[in-house]
Amino acid sequence: MHDAVTRPTPPADATAWPRRITQAVKIGGVTVGGGHPVVVQSMTNTDTADIAGSVKQVADLWRAGSEMVRLTVNNAESAAAIPRIVDKLRMMGIDVPLIGDFHYNGHQLLAAEPACAEALAKYRINPGNVGFGKKKDLQFGQLIECAIKYDKPVRIGANWGSLDQSLAAQLMDENAQRETPWDAGRVLREALIRSALDSAERAVELGLPRERIILSAKVSGVQELIAVYRDMASRCDFALHLGLTEAGIGSKGIVASAAALSVLLQEGIGDTIRISLTPEPGQSRTHEVIVAQELLQTTGQRAFTPMVTACPGCGRTTSEFFQELAGVVQNHVRAKMPEWKITNPGAENMTLAVMGCVVNGPGESRHANIGISLPGTGEAPSAPVFIDGEKSVILRGENIAQEFIGLIDQYVERTYARRAG
């Protein structure tokens, strides 16, 4: 059992809790926290020194919707590659903020490669491995001094798997002196939070403004993550980065991330997220970006692309056509969004329905901006289309998919077209 955490009373209506008030952190052209929309970020899995491969993957992630991209900076070659990666991306018209992920030797790499220090939009620092023993404070200070020199924000990110062992041991010793000792899990959660908070306050003492700091304290368990972030959010006003350390592969990773992050987001906690999925063989790295966007959209935080409601199918829907049409519609609107974002702003808020029989089909279709109710088993071979709650037309024949796509495009142009003046 986890210790009870005081939380606000849920709202009476179907909305989320108000967003937590935090510092606003400027990262390149993106602002995190301060009431701004929750930001989607991702991380490459290329060798950063492979400039061509890294540029391609960053570009792919950006096109998929990642608003910040983190890259490993673990040696001199990767540090030297960063400014070249930034230059090549800008030549492609891509100005996405790049975050340098540092462990163990970040203080050395940034000092040796000032062009890297300048090119990065943010530094990620792990207080659990920034230095050990007497070197810890010195090396942490060198990283913060670099951030101050180049006016860069930092994320101080504590991780369950690389926790500051000296701090953990100290808290274990203190716990042993309690009249009623905490369980080991609570002590470790406190160590994780303290590692992040104490490091942040030390950075402020060294001269880094509070509005240049983001915090994270990641674990891999859903309930542990929720408990850690609720506690940390109640103890500071820093912007928070949400994510499981390792969510896992396939549906497990998606479900775990959604289970943890949706609870926190609905409570107003979290200013930027990453879904740390393990890609399945042959799967694009961009999948984690799509999942992050869908999580934010389904929880009502942001809108990225029109949402398609589709029934799961049952014995009344022996035809697979409605399933195929739902996929075609989803792919069409996702492919059109980069264009619509410019020419038809607001189209991302559109709702669509592709239903498979008369039971819920007409009702769900009326709730959507545009919906189609396809015939189920034994029903007449016709498909009524509803637009803004009213029956508009009945589609029949072999070209239902093309005609329905055409109606969607017409609706977008009619409803969301950017008007001159």
Swiss-Prot record:
Q: Which UniProt keywords apply?
A: 4Fe-4S, Iron, Iron-sulfur, Isoprene biosynthesis, Metal-binding, Oxidoreductase
Which InterPro entries is this protein grouped with?
Dihydropteroate_synth-like_sf, IspG_bac, IspG_bac-typ, NO2/SO3_Rdtase_4Fe4S_sf
Tell me how the cofactor is bound.
Binds 1 [4Fe-4S] cluster.
GO BP annotations of the record are: isopentenyl diphosphate biosynthetic process, methylerythritol 4-phosphate pathway; terpenoid biosynthetic process
The Swiss-Prot or TrEMBL record lists the needed cofactor(s) as: [4Fe-4S] cluster
In alphabetical order, the GO MF annotations are: 4 iron, 4 sulfur cluster binding; 4-hydroxy-3-methylbut-2-en-1-yl diphosphate synthase activity (ferredoxin); 4-hydroxy-3-methylbut-2-enyl-diphosphate synthase activity (flavodoxin); iron ion binding
A Pfam family annotated for this chain is GcpE
What's the EC number here? Answer: 1.17.7.3
Decide whether keyword Zinc is in the record: no
Catalytic activity reads: (2E)-4-hydroxy-3-methylbut-2-enyl diphosphate + oxidized [flavodoxin] + H2O + 2 H(+) = 2-C-methyl-D-erythritol 2,4-cyclic diphosphate + reduced [flavodoxin]
Q: Which pathway features in its UniProt record?
A: Isoprenoid biosynthesis; isopentenyl diphosphate biosynthesis via DXP pathway; isopentenyl diphosphate from 1-deoxy-D-xylulose 5-phosphate: step 5/6
Amino acids binding [4Fe-4S] cluster: 311, 314, 357, 364
Family indicated by similarity: Belongs to the IspG family.
This protein's name? 4-hydroxy-3-methylbut-2-en-1-yl diphosphate synthase (flavodoxin)
| Organism of provenance | Xanthomonas oryzae pv. oryzae (strain MAFF 311018)
- Gene it is expressed from: ispG
